[in-house]
Amino acid sequence: MMMQSDRSEQPRGPAAGKALRKYLAQYAEPEAARIRECLAVDRRYGHVLCIPAYGEGEGLLQSLSSVPEGPRGEILIIVVVNESNSSPDWVREANQDSLAALRGRLAGAAGLGTPMERQRHPRGDLLVIDRTHTGLVLPEDHGVGLARKIGADVALALWTAGGIESPWIHCSDADVLFPADYFS
């Protein structure tokens, strides 16, 4: 009897494919290369969820509090708070409200003195990537697509290193209330 192979058995680490290694080395966003500095080297997650946040304000916390448990274990939630130089004032203010609310929760967070900070979340860990300051804002006309790419590149780098079990990179919006079976 032949058994189907589980997609989570795809090559990782040194066995990862040449194309994947090339992508991470040449095309991934800079946060992907620095992620292991912010997370414990031996930390493992069952699932990863990427959420771009643009002008969400404190409402982002409601979405984060609705993240359900994952059947494969703890979840790494990557939130990319982002704006561009031309973002309206209300977006900038809402982003600063989001960051202030998250930093209120991030007391004792593991950071690098950089725009990435990690804290415990009831379902695993929360990684906040701040792309709202001079030199870090997103280029014009890249918006949510680039913010999702930043989160996905970080997730891919962790998956390749064996830090995430599920082969799925989940992406959602910052104003969503998640159903209990989201990761099923």
Tell me what each language-model feature is:
Residues 50-54, 137-145, 172-177:
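Short, charged/polar micro-motifs that form catalytic or ligand-binding hotspots
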Residues 34, 60-65, 111-114, 181-184:
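Short alpha-helical segments and helix-capping/turn motifs at coil-helix boundaries
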Residues 2-76, 83:
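N-proximal low-complexity "stem/linker" segments adjacent to membrane-targeting elements
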Residues 58, 163-167, 171-184:
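Acidic donor-binding/catalytic loop of UDP-sugar-dependent glycosyltransferases
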